[in-house]
Amino acid sequence: MKTLNRRDFPGAQYPERIIQFGEGNFLRAFVDWQIDLLNEHTDLNSGVVVVRPIETSFPPSLSTQDGLYTTIIRGLNEKGEAVSDARLIRSVNREISVYSEYDEFLKLAHNPEMRFVFSNTTEAGISYHAGDKFDDAPAVSYPAKLTRLLFERFSHFNGALDKGWIIIPCELIDYNGDALRELVLRYAQEWALPEAFIQWLDQANSFCSTLVDRIVTGYPRDEVAKLEEELGYHDGFLDTAEYFYLFVIQGPKSLATELRLDKYPLNVLIVDDIKPYKERKVAILNGAHTALVPVAFQAGLDTVGEAMNDAEICAFVEKAIYEEIIPVLDLPRDELESFASAVTGRFRNPYIKHQLLSIALNGMTKFRTRILPQLLAGQKANGTLPARLTFALAALIAFYRGERNGETYPVQDDAHWLERYQQLWSQYRDRVIGTQELVAIVLAEKDHWEQDLTQVPGLVEQVANDLDAILEKGMREAVRPLC
């Protein structure tokens, strides 16, 4: 069986116009996949040079396959049908290592056609590294490497304003474009680079903040033989991802034309502020996960897919989203409902086995950031507590007993909460405290909740009543009236 390469698998090759820091699965099934579609359907005509930003030889370089690889996009489409679509990606031309090919790296700045910089260097990638110097070959941090490359560009083209770049980081931190820009400016000042360069950074370059959303499951180790048999070739860089994707970019409106999105629309939004989209994702996608996990797991289910195929649990989650989360969010209702519909479709994806226990990690913090804001907003708007979000809190407290049907399961959270719950449930079993007192102690933890939740009218009583129902009747019976 042949391995992918451009000689045996000839096809389109595009001039290099995009630099990409990061060779991982996510960017390859997200950014490069989208660029490949735009190259095929429009005159974007842009090839990608991947820069490996860290010093490692694993995995091997994409250049061993001349930049070619296959994405397999699988999930439920808009009609709820299971689809699996294999695509040979031709948008990547080559990969270079900034450590072993530093001169080649700097040379990227000399190409007049270069226009875009994408990156995913993990959440820790957009950070300051104190020892980084201008003459390092290379500097350690990604922002320092980028500063050096931008200065090379500035110098080579004598500060030409039409030679700036559109810089689009995909790292999972809030306002990633702003954070990256601040660090580039910090290095420029620390390295005493000319004032003209700092002005050029501002005038000629755009740093765009983003929100990225797609579950990328990566190399399908267990299915490789079967998939390669179907494809008819060997691919060491096979990359699998879910059907859904969303790319929200906070940037100039002209970006839609530059990326040719006006000619071939993708699920890419160019917006003035990513904040409401971030809130939507956290509240609906992450919030639904967090509400679902303790309820579904204690109802005897193990994966998100099983939960969504269970009529009662599915109804509980959908009612929580549509009746309690969406009404308090600040975006047009039709947009929110369309996103929510995509979310429940993603939860049903038959190709992804998402273990409930793995999502349960750090459940207390997740509840505070993902559900509490909507619970409090609902109480404020209606004068009553949202029943399902409140029940989810009771289910979460019950989950920290660490026992289901007489069998123990691992609970993962910070040491404070693990010790706290061990102590509280032990006191409950010894009849030192009742449910109302147990709930009040949890809700009074100001350091965690950033407020005293026992002051929210009726919250302690409602959570305690729900907890009583769970303990006395079991999760199935307790949740039924809310389904």
From Swiss-Prot:
Keywords: NAD, Oxidoreductase. The keyword Lipid metabolism does not apply. Pathway: Carbohydrate metabolism; pentose and glucuronate interconversion. GO terms for biological process: D-galacturonate catabolic process; mannitol catabolic process. InterPro entries: 6-PGluconate_DH-like_C_sf, 6PGD_dom2, Altronate_OxRdtase, Mannitol_DH_C, Mannitol_DH_N, NAD(P)-bd_dom_sf. NAD(+) binds at residues 18-29. Pfam families: Mannitol_dh, Mannitol_dh_C. It catalyses: D-altronate + NAD(+) = keto-D-tagaturonate + NADH + H(+). Its EC number is 1.1.1.58. Signal peptide: none annotated. One of its GO terms (molecular function) is mannitol-1-phosphate 5-dehydrogenase activity. This is Altronate oxidoreductase. It is an enzyme of class 1 (oxidoreductase). Belongs to the mannitol dehydrogenase family. UxaB subfamily. GO terms for cellular component: cytosol. It comes from the Bacteria.
